[in-house]
Amino acid sequence: MRFDVITLFPELFTPFLASGVTRRAYATGLVDVRFWNPRDYAEGNYRRVDDRPFGGGPGMVMMAEPLERCLRAIRADRGEAPEAVAPLVMFSPIGRRLDHDGVAGWAAGNGAVLLCGRYEGVDQRFVDAHVDVQLSLGDFVLSGGEIPAMALLDAVARLQPGVLNDAGSHQEDSFNAALDGLLDCPHYTRPESWQGQAVPAALLSGHHAQIERWRRDQRLAVTARHRPDLVEAARVAGRLDRADEAVLAKLNGLL
């Protein structure tokens, strides 16, 4: 899969691509990431890519023409058939919030062109003409789209086969369908006792069924406490059995 990133600051991605477990995906080309600076497609001695907004107001707006030239170069480099053009994704506060299901969809695809906006935003005429999808990380504003782009790339990369040390690691992530969309359970490691706090006995029992039941109960408890909407979604989807409901009934008196 291939992601082409349109950014005025490609250097921000250098440590990101070279660090952590997901670097394998980028180093091997399993996730091919290429960078395009719209300044390279701007005209004039100053290579200007932004200008003042019509109507006045603070800040600057990214100009449509350099972005379109940049996008045109990307399309030519990708050599895409008209019916298989990669979607252009722009990160914006008005976009759909990126979640696990969305990441899974991108991870199963062939990639995209990611537009990292800056300043007050992008000329709306370019957005209307070329942007296919708008995504957001949440109800807050960042200085640019680079951090959301990194978040999407990292989330997609770790779902690719062979990237994580344990192929099944992501199957036990929070929100995963394998966990019925619940949050993950607490985790413990050595020593068995730390500052007077012991590891839960179930995890030391060696009894796999008991361990799995404990983990399931903990997932239910954590999710009910922090994201009750996910519990209700699992219930509506028919993913909770009688044992789960019994655990939740006990929790209701404690939360």
Swiss-Prot record:
UniProt entry keywords in alphabetical sequence: Cytoplasm, Methyltransferase, S-adenosyl-L-methionine, Transferase, tRNA processing
Keyword Transferase included in the entry's annotation: yes
GO cellular component terms attached to this protein's record: cytosol
TM segment ranges: none
One Pfam family from the record: tRNA_m1G_MT
Gene3D superfamilies for this protein: 3.40.1280.10, tRNA(m1g37)methyltransferase, domain 2
SUPFAM superfamilies for the chain: alpha/beta knot (SSF75217)
Compartments in which it is found: Cytoplasm
Alphabetized GO MF terms: tRNA (guanine(37)-N1)-methyltransferase activity
Record-listed S-adenosyl-L-methionine binding positions: G117, L137, G138, D139, F140, V141, L142
Catalyses which reaction(s): guanosine(37) in tRNA + S-adenosyl-L-methionine = N(1)-methylguanosine(37) in tRNA + S-adenosyl-L-homocysteine + H(+)
Enzyme Commission number, as recorded: 2.1.1.228
CDD domains for the chain: TrmD-like
BP terms from Gene Ontology: tRNA N1-guanine methylation
Family: Belongs to the RNA methyltransferase TrmD family.
Its biological purpose: Specifically methylates guanosine-37 in various tRNAs.
Subunit structure: Homodimer.
Protein name in UniProt: tRNA (guanine-N(1)-)-methyltransferase
Species per Swiss-Prot/TrEMBL record: Paracidovorax citrulli (strain AAC00-1) (Acidovorax citrulli)
Gene: trmD
